[in-house]
Amino acid sequence: MSHGHSHGGGCSCESEPSDGPERGLEYGLFRKIDLDKLQCLNESREGSGRSVFRAWEERNDRTRFVESDDDEELLFNIPFTGNVKLKGIVLIGEDSDTHPAELRLFKNVPHMSFDDTGREADQTFSLNIDVNGNLEYPTKIARFSNVSHLSIHISKNFGAENTKIYYIGLRGEWTEAHRHEVTICNYEAAANPADHKVSQITPQTNFIS
């Protein structure tokens, strides 16, 4: 049962899809997260931010959660093991003011800090209190069609000093990253004038020898 808490600003569009066996498959993107490299800034207990990304069938496990430390904000840096087309997001919290009121998404900005959250988000949602995962917030799919890294900024809650989250579900499609594309990107990032000079004189050297 969803509650009628709403928050001004941003998009508050949500849907209530049917809860069948296929729902667990739809929310399987947690398997494509590089959990060892996932970061959650301002978590009160180290490593607890990772625990909220889990199987749909385990979404109501209240023993696993993340709680903010100094204030109400949380920032998740989520690297994927390939490229993701993100279609929707579900968030479960408590039926209290600790529930997040606003969620902001940033794509392909690794290692974000709170200082970086002043930039415009790729999409912002105003959240309603959801204790069972009944509400899905659909993303702008065209904007999130090629995501290798996702940052989730919980910017505010409904008035409590700290924020508490039990579950975050990500729905979408995953494709394996092509190794040769990564190699090309790495080369271009490391390119310098010396590299180009070497390539220019190499044919001449081969000709002389």
UniProtKB/Swiss-Prot annotation:
Keyword Cytoplasm in annotation: yes
Protein family (similarity comment): Belongs to the PITHD1 family.
GO cellular component, one term: nucleus
Annotated source species: Xenopus laevis (African clawed frog)
Chief site of localization: cytoplasm
Gene for this chain: pithd1
Cysteine disulfide links: none
Record localization: Cytoplasm
GO BP term, example: positive regulation of DNA-templated transcription
Database matches in Gene3D superfamilies: PITH domain
Stated role: May play a role in promoting megakaryocyte differentiation by up-regulating RUNX1 expression.
Domain PITH span(s) in chain numbering: 18-190
Name the UniProt record assigns to this protein: PITH domain-containing protein 1
Entry-linked Pfam families: PITH (PF06201)
Keyword list, A-Z: Activator, Cytoplasm, Transcription, Transcription regulation
